[in-house]
């Protein structure tokens, strides 16, 4: 029974309604700004990927840039329509991972998770290299140092995320609006020009247009289509984050998804029209987007605005992976598919291990590619389209099982999308296999295998520990504490005092070697021990070799099995130096003993730290 308490002179209507947190969630506009960074940023490298492939057929091949882009825009429309259905069917979010886990089984969901992991990692590498490419297009003198610039940008983003940042959707609105607005201004102005107003950016750079041009065949067009499909990355981001929207969540997320598709499609088509109109050719060291800005707006302040807006948006796009991948790794760790360390948070509410893992792998990719975006883009497309295909196939099964009103049309739409994305996956894998796509083909099953292996290991550990069952009642056993000593000191006294409080019986042990010098030290220790008389026996362990840990471990095994049930504890006294550098002065004898006892016995190991203050 609840009781309503009202202050004198107040009415229930005067009370402030409870804060449900809705005001902190995303609207369609803020959701578009926060979750479309990957998709919007892809216009910086998607059209260029098409142009680079078609350049193999010379100027005639570049004439097919617009038709290929229209085909990609058509696929974008199918994907947007498909993901609207994913949002409606899975309002709790999760995207391809949630769809696969529900309708395609655990192993397929792991494939989706692995593709998401690759997507996040490659997004960082591609975004960083594309951002640096925009920077070097504006400042050509930096081109030879692009790899170091990439690593520096990655280091900065990593440092910021390790410190912990509070993400706000409103903070993403300004850079997103500036970038999208500048692209549309570029397109709008360019459509009214019959010729480039400036070619200063491309002057002095070598063209990569093929001199021995090949014919424009179906294979070349398919290859260009598959490469350009990298522009579709990020289309699934809104479906992954439906719970972040305000009520009605599904409807707002669907509106944001449609807006994303419309804006991205218009930008891709508009840029392709300008590429054809200005007869642009790919040149080394200058991005296609930089050439378009130069041709439409001139080599002035507007050109630099677009370049810096591109750099900032791509940096933010890379940053989204640092927010998304550690969370995905946390979920996989909670499901026992990754080491549990990935589920831990640092003092700043940061999944530090996930952030560091992402940074290390991304840095390796940057070194592998030499800081070149076009080397990484084909790898990016494979992981993305594997996730697309899994989501579409899962949705077909969803509609077949649900069989609601109009289910056949919905299943047909998702099936058509699965066919298109599946074909794109095969084409880009086959065409780019020798150029690096083999890395994804090998890594994807290895990741899935690693997930399964970790899961089995945790299952065995859980079975051994009896997780989920009531354990036996605790009982007391006879306890013996063994203390390794090599000399008499205050540390020895502190160790024996601690040992006496831990066990029923305490024994000190010392290892003796056959060398005359060592025997002399042993006799001196035994005389001092007898004179001190601590009430604890000193046991001599003879060892013919110079091993320290093995004789102690052998003695522990002997006393543990020779008498009644005994809980053996090995208490290892060690000093804790006052300063960090003084650790170099230690002989590490305690670590050697602990390692041997841990590896060869079931004894409890206790390491007593004596602070040297």
Task: Specify the residue positions occupied by each region the protein language model found.
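Loop-to-transmembrane helix boundary motifs in multi-pass membrane proteins
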Residues: 106, 146-151, 244-267, 333-367, ...
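Extracellular/periplasmic helix-exit of transmembrane alpha-helices
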Residues: 190-198, 254-290
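Helix-loop-helix junctions that connect adjacent transmembrane segments
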Residues: 177, 181-233, 431, 435, ...
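Cytosolic C-terminal regulatory domains/tails of membrane transporters and channels
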Residues: 1-22, 460-613
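Hydrophobic alpha-helical segments and their helix-loop junctions in multi-pass secondary transporters
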Residues: 179-205, 272-279, 389-404, 453-462
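C-terminal membrane-solvent junction of multi-pass transporters and transport-like membrane proteins
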Residues: 32, 341-352, 388-433, 468-471
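Extracellular loop-to-transmembrane helix junctions
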Residues: 50-101, 107-115, 126-153, 261-269
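Membrane-interface loop-to-helix entry segments
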Residues: 154-192, 256-260, 377-390, 409-420, ...
């Amino acid at each position: 029974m609840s009781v309503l308490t009202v202050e004198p002179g107040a009415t229930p209507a005067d009370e402030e309604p409870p804060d449900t947190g809705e005001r902190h969630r995303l609207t369609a506009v803020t959701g578009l700004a926060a979750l479309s960074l990957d998709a919007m940023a892809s216009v910086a490298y998607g059209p260029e990927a098409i142009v680079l492939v078609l350049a193999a057929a010379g100027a005639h091949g570049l004439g097919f840039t617009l038709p290929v882009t229209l085909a990609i825009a058509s696929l974008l429309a199918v994907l947007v329509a498909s993901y609207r259905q994913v949002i409606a069917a899975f309002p709790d979010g999760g995207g391809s991972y949630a769809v696969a886990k529900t309708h395609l089984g655990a192993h397929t969901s792991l494939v989706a998770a692995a593709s998401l992991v690759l997507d996040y990692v490659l997004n960082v590498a591609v975004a960083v290299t594309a951002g640096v490419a925009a920077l070097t297009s504006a400042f050509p003198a930096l081109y030879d140092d692009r790899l170091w610039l990439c690593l520096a940008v990655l280091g900065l983003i990593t440092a910021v995320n390790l410190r912990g940042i509070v993400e706000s959707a409103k903070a993403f609105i300004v850079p997103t609006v500036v970038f999208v607005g500048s692209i549309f201004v570029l397109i709008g102005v360019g459509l009214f020009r019959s010729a480039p107003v400036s070619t200063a950016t491309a002057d002095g750079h070598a063209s990569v247009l093929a001199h021995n041009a090949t014919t424009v065949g179906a294979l070349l067009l398919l290859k260009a289509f598959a490469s350009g499909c990298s522009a579709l990355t990020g289309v699934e981001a809104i479906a992954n984050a439906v719970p972040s929207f305000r009520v009605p969540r599904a409807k707002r997320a669907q509106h944001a998804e449609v807006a994303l598709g419309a804006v991205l499609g218009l930008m891709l088509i508009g840029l392709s029209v300008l590429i054809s109109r200005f007869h642009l050719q790919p040149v080394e060291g200058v991005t296609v987007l930089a050439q378009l800005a130069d041709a439409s707006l001139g080599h002035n302040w507007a050109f630099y605005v677009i370049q810096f807006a591109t750099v900032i948006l791509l940096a933010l796009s890379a940053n989204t992976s640092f927010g998304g991948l550690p969370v995905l790794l946390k979920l996989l760790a909670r499901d026992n598919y990754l080491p549990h360390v990935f589920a831990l948070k640092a003092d700043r509410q940061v999944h530090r291990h996930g952030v560091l893992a992402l940074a290390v792998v991304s840095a390796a990719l940057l070194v592998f590619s030499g800081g070149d975006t076009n080397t990484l883009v084909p790898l990016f497309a494979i992981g993305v389209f594997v996730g697309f295909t899994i989501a579409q196939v899962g949705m077909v099964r969803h509609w077949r099982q649900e069989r609601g009103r109009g289910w056949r049309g919905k299943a047909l739409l998702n099936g058509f999308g699965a066919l298109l994305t599946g074909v794109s996956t095969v084409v880009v894998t086959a065409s780019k296999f020798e150029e690096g796509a083999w890395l994804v083909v090998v890594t994807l099953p290895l990741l899935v295998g690693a997930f399964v292996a970790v899961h089995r290991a945790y299952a065995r550990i859980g079975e051994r520990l009896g997780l989920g069952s009531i354990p036996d009642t605790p009982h007391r056993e006879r306890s013996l504490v063994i203390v390794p000593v090599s000399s008499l000191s205050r540390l020895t006294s502190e160790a024996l005092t601690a040992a006496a409080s831990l066990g029923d019986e305490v024994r000190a042990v010392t290892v003796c070697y056959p060398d005359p010098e060592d025997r002399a030290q042993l006799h001196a220790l035994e005389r001092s021990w007898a004179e001190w008389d601590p009430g604890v026996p000193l046991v001599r362990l003879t060892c013919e070799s110079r091993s320290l840990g093995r004789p102690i471990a052998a003695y522990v095994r002997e006393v543990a099995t020779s008498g009644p049930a005994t809980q053996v504890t090995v208490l290892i006294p060690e000093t804790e130096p006052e300063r960090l550098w003084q650790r170099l002065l230690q002989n590490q004898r305690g670590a050697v003993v602990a390692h041997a006892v841990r590896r060869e016995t079931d004894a409890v190991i206790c390491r007593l730290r004596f602070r040297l203050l």
